[in-house]
Amino acid sequence: MSVTDPIADMLTRIRNAQQVNKAKVRMPASKLKRAIARVLVEEGYIQEVKEDVANGHPVLDLTLKYYAGAGVIAEIRRVSRPGVRVYRGAEDLPRVRDGFGIAIISTSQGIMTDRAARSAGIGGEVLCVVS
């Protein structure tokens, strides 16, 4: 079965797994999902990412992060969707929770946080926000 929005599917899998205190979550892999997972690891929202093969297809195994029994991710939400794409210039990139969260941006130089895109002076598609 094909998924209309693979990024929304990834975020939903992470959100659902964290709500039931799962240690790991597995999902189909893609270049974009790997890049988003890398940003989440760098920013400390998930513990680690491993790549595996299941039934001949590449999959990502994400190890979720918890603090005092609660998930580190309070909110993870898709912004730009297939039906309504959201593009912002460097000066208009969203500030999530006054800098305590991140927005993940797809730019011409790759996937990065809003802070990195702002400091590089480039805008792009606002994929999701995490706090």
Curated annotation (Swiss-Prot):
Signal peptide: none annotated. One of its GO terms (cellular component) is ribonucleoprotein complex. Belongs to the universal ribosomal protein uS8 family. One of the primary rRNA binding proteins, it binds directly to 16S rRNA central domain where it helps coordinate assembly of the platform of the 30S subunit. PROSITE patterns: RIBOSOMAL_S8. Keywords: Ribonucleoprotein, Ribosomal protein, RNA-binding, rRNA-binding. The gene is rpsH. PANTHER family: 40S RIBOSOMAL PROTEIN S15A (PTHR11758). GO terms for biological process: translation. InterPro entries: Ribosomal_uS8, Ribosomal_uS8_CS, Ribosomal_uS8_sf. This is Small ribosomal subunit protein uS8. The lineage of its organism: Bacteria, Pseudomonadati, Pseudomonadota, Acidithiobacillia, Acidithiobacillales. HAMAP family: Ribosomal_uS8_B. It comes from the Bacteria. Part of the 30S ribosomal subunit. Contacts proteins S5 and S12. One of its GO terms (molecular function) is rRNA binding.
